[in-house]
């Protein structure tokens, strides 16, 4: 049977597709911009048909209606990363959080520590051979589909076709729902003086020919702003946003010096505007792979001069980093931070950077603290922290004693907190 006939046989409405999900199933949603909006909406709309579905995903870009009060009988969310629409549910006990490194998520599915009953995915239209691309969301979505008993795909004509190892054949999909809604977009944030100063300090650590990992938000965008005079930069990152695209167009990022996948931008997912999605569509420079490859520290380390740039909530004077909680309150997750810090530390000539504003709470709270808040999660241990950067400078911690680490961190804290930090330093050292 030709793939076109298979496709037509599997084509149903969103309501019909989700009706195939059985009670008490574990349902994995595609990640971030890849969230299959029509399928999720149909699931929530028909909530009364379900009892005890476990909803698993990382970042949700939608409204997260399945986590709202009154939904507990129908849905229980298991967050692998806590985002804006799921934070309240996790901290109030209506949802759960599973700590994990991003690169390990596919193994949770494949090794059946989290057996997948249903995968709800969003993919591109099929090519002439019947292959759909996972587009903006390869990450754990492809492994989830490969592990699931039931695969329901939202085939969106607006999903870009990304290359690499990013494909699923229509014969491997159980039900197909066609969609034409625009992909969710994330607009670039406005950059303030603090972010620009941090970006400039980070950029001073990046040499020509380096391979970069950056996240999303004001600080990564500020770093990119100060890379315009660099040469032959490369990208091996869990994600990219619009700023990377602009540096490619400017010729700054060309991936020529990469020692792994030379000439290629390697990512596992994307978040940005339609311009970015159009840029990656059928672009042979951009390749996506599942997160157990892209974020594996033993893969990352194969890039010489690998520079990872991540942020956090707090750093204490020993160099311990909390990136996911305020005390006991879970506000995000581990994500790929530790994956890339470890990979950069193992890389020949690599650098692992934690970049943060010196204060929080409108300047009332120092992010550099004597100790992490009670109950705060240690996301990155003091043994793995290399550089810490604020708007006031750079602290290089690798190889330093606890005493010298503390002094270096106090020197880049906000001036109004340095005296109190030094007083705590004197009590301990």
Swiss-Prot record:
Record-listed E.C. numbers: 2.8.3.-
Name by which UniProt lists this protein: 4-hydroxybutyrate coenzyme A transferase
Active site: 238
Transmembrane segments: none
Family listed: Belongs to the acetyl-CoA hydrolase/transferase family.
Pfam family, one: AcetylCoA_hydro
SUPFAM superfamilies on file: NagB/RpiA/CoA transferase-like
Record's keyword annotation contains Cell division: no
Record keywords, A-Z: Transferase
Binding site for CoA: 215-219, 336
Domain of life: Bacteria
GO biological process, one term: acetate metabolic process
Coiled coil: none
GO MF annotations, alphabetized: acetate CoA-transferase activity
């Amino acid at each position: 049977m030709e793939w076109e006939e298979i496709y037509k046989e599997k084509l149903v409405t969103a309501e019909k597709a989700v009706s195939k999900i059985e009670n008490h199933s574990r349902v994995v949603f595609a990640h971030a911009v890849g969230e299959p909006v029509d399928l999720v909406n149909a699931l929530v709309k028909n909530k009364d048909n379900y009892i005890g579905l476990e909803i698993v995903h990382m970042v949700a870009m939608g409204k997260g209606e399945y986590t709202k009060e009154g939904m507990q009988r129908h849905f229980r969310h298991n967050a692998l990363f806590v985002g804006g629409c799921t934070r309240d549910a996790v901290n109030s006990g209506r949802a759960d959080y599973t700590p994990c490194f991003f690169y390990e998520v596919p193994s949770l599915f494949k090794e059946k520590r989290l057996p997948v009953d249903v995968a709800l995915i969003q993919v591109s239209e099929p090519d002439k051979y019947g292959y759909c691309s996972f587009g903006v969301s390869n990450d754990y979505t492809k492994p989830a589909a490969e592990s699931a008993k039931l695969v329901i795909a939202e085939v969106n004509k607006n999903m870009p076709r990304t290359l690499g190892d990013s494909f699923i054949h229509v014969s491997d999909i159980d039900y197909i729902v066609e969609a034409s809604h625009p992909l969710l977009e994330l607009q670039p944030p406005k950059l303030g003086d603090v972010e620009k100063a941090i970006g400039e300090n980070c950029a001073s650590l990046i040499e020509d020919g380096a391979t970069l990992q950056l996240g999303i938000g004001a600080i990564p965008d500020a770093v990119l702003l100060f890379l315009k005079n660099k040469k032959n930069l490369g990208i091996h990152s869990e994600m990219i946003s619009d700023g990377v695209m602009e540096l490619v167009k400017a010729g700054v990022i060309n991936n020529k010096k990469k020692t792994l996948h030379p000439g290629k931008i390697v990512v596992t997912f994307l978040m940005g505007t339609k311009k970015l999605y159009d840029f990656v569509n059928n672009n042979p420079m951009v390749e996506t792979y599942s997160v157990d490859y892209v974020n594996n520290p033993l893969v990352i380390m194969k890039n010489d001069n690998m520079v990872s740039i991540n942020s956090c909530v707090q750093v204490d004077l020993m160099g311990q980093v909390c990136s996911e909680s305020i005390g006991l309150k879970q506000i995000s997750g581990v994500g790929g931070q530790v994956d890339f810090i470890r990979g950069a530390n193992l890389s020949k000539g690599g650098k692992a950077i934690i970049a943060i504003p010196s204060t929080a709470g409108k300047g009332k709270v120092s992010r550099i603290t004597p100790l992490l808040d009670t109950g705060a999660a240690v996301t990155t241990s003091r043994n793995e922290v290399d550089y810490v950067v604020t708007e006031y400078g750079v602290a290089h911690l690798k190889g330093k004693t606890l005493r010298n680490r503390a002094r270096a961190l106090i020197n880049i804290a906000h001036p109004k907190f340095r005296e109190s930090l030094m007083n705590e330093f004197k009590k301990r050292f």
